[in-house]
Amino acid sequence: NKNTPSPTIPDFSKNALVGDTVTFSDQDFSVQNGDGIKLTSITITVLPDPGAGTLTLGGQPLAADSVVKASALAGLRFQSLSQPSVTTTTFSFLPTFDNGTQAQQPTTVTLYLLTAANEAPIARNMDLSTYKNVAITGYFDAVDSEGDTLTFQLMDTPARGAVTLAEDGSAKFVYTPYENKTGKDSFTYVAIDSAGNTSSEAKVTIQINKPDTKVTYADMEGDPAHKASIRLAEEGIFVGSYLNGEYFFDPDRPVTRAEFLTMAMATVGMAPLEDVTTTGFTDDAAIPTWAKGAVSAAVMAGVIQGSRDDSGAPVFDASENITQGEATVMLDQLLNLSDVPLEVFSAQGSDAHWAGQAAANLAASGVIRVEETNSAALSTGLDRAQAAMLLDGALDVLSQREEDGWLPW
């Protein structure tokens, strides 16, 4: 399953104000995939653009093919010109290790010369969970005070699975456990801003559990909602169809208003009313019998209000495909979330979609991402995969509350 990767030193970036000196430390030259292997020296293969400045060691300019011992790297400097003709440059080197090997690919160091100070981003530790043989999609959690675009880099790889980073350098990643592995796994990452600042390392911890259900879906491998679909089955909230000895989740199937309401109520533990024959909505006859108890309980709790038809009468539209905005409002009410500042947790600030406040509340709670709070996303119909991920996030909120000693119902 696991191929032992060769030791390497990842590409990195540094910056300084124009005219200042870039300094280096041992931490900049940390060995990745080394398993105890240490760096002994580096061989400079490409020098920085002389129009930006000069790379020196002990005050003396370095030439191409110069060898710098690891013990001397703290004396490495890049002196910026006071009036550089270029403000971004690179140099490269080949690392040599104490096992006698040299890296197959050079490490590239990007140097940024700034006209104003720029703070490093902050990367946060993360805790995720999945099931045996189920890949999960995650998003690195980092912020930058200047709002710079961030890219991400692994510093330490996991032992029980593999991590695939997004090709576009975004925060998205996929963790795939090795076959039949369970238990705790972890890896570390850093965030790098567009000025070349690198955050401190943050740790992603992943718990790989054996699912408490026999349900496995034939149509969910590789789907970002795979883990969520298994969790809904495990929690007794929803199980897909069973045909010819296999379970199918139908991730692209639209979800109706009645379906999402009943699943969301089951998620938070809110019981439907019993022996309900009529809900009070004008379109009551179109509400499935199995949903009437849930609809009535939700109305009484203020979770739903329905809408008005052309004559002004209240209707629920039970069989209509629910939009992400409508689902967001339902879940916000069921979780009893506090309102958060729109300008912080909304992709559109004060000009948000009518469901923008609910979406911001869910984003602040980690149920959805801020990028999912815009009008376009909230106006689209919800499919089963999206519903599963919403409810999976809600279960995480409830689990955290249980740890904190507070339950919503």
Predicted region positions:
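Conserved structural position at the C-terminal beta-strand
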Residues: P95-F97, A191
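Low-complexity "stalk/linker" and mucin-like segments enriched in Ser/Thr/Pro/Ala/Gly
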Residues: P48-A72, M155-S170, S241
